[in-house]
């Protein structure tokens, strides 16, 4: 009688069930808003012109992206919008535009030709 292969299969099934439960538990713990989960969260610190810095937390899911940062101590939640190039986030009066490792923050209440609120922001490791 061959009980070893059956026992090995039973162990494999138990292991897969455990891994599946762990993955489901991780997805359930991922931050989210109204049922939209963001399994990919990363923080990036930028060094900008004038010695200014900006810390941004990016929340990514397959269909939704958001960025959270603070301006004058107040949190800004910006969501991704259509962009011809790079990633563009808009929240409140601010627009955060990134391309590669560089970003620019604009205050949309200022004139269109006004200097950015933060310019030449470079991601720091």
Curated annotation (Swiss-Prot):
Residues where lipid is bound covalently (S-diacylglycerol cysteine): 22
Main location: membrane
InterPro entries in the record: MliC, MliC_sf
Keyword Signal: yes
Subcellular location field: Cell outer membrane
The keyword Transmembrane helix belongs to this UniProt entry's keyword annotation: no
Any one GO cellular component localisation term in the record: cell outer membrane
Keyword list, A-Z: Cell outer membrane, Disulfide bond, Lipoprotein, Membrane, Palmitate, Signal
N-palmitoyl cysteine lipid attachment residues: 22
Topology relative to the membrane: Lipid-anchor
Disulfide bonds: 48-121
Quaternary organization: Homodimer.
Record function comment: Specifically inhibits C-type lysozymes.
Family statement: Belongs to the MliC family. Type 2 subfamily.
Protein name (database record): Membrane-bound lysozyme inhibitor of C-type lysozyme
Phylogenetic classification of the source organism: Bacteria, Pseudomonadati, Pseudomonadota, Betaproteobacteria, Burkholderiales
């Amino acid at each position: 009688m061959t009980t070893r292969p059956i026992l090995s299969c039973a162990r494999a099934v138990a292991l897969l069930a455990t891994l599946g439960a762990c993955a489901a538990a991780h997805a359930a713990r991922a931050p989210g808003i109204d049922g939209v989960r963001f399994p990919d969260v990363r923080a990036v610190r930028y060094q900008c012109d004038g010695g200014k810095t900006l810390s941004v937390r990016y929340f990514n899911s397959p269909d939704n992206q958001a960025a959270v940062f603070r301006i004058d101590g107040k949190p800004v939640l910006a969501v991704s919008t259509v962009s011809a190039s790079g990633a563009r986030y808009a929240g409140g009066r601010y627009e955060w535009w990134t391309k590669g490792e560089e970003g620019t923050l604009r205050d949309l209440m200022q004139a269109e030709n006004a200097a950015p609120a933060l310019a030449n922001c470079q991601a720091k490791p």
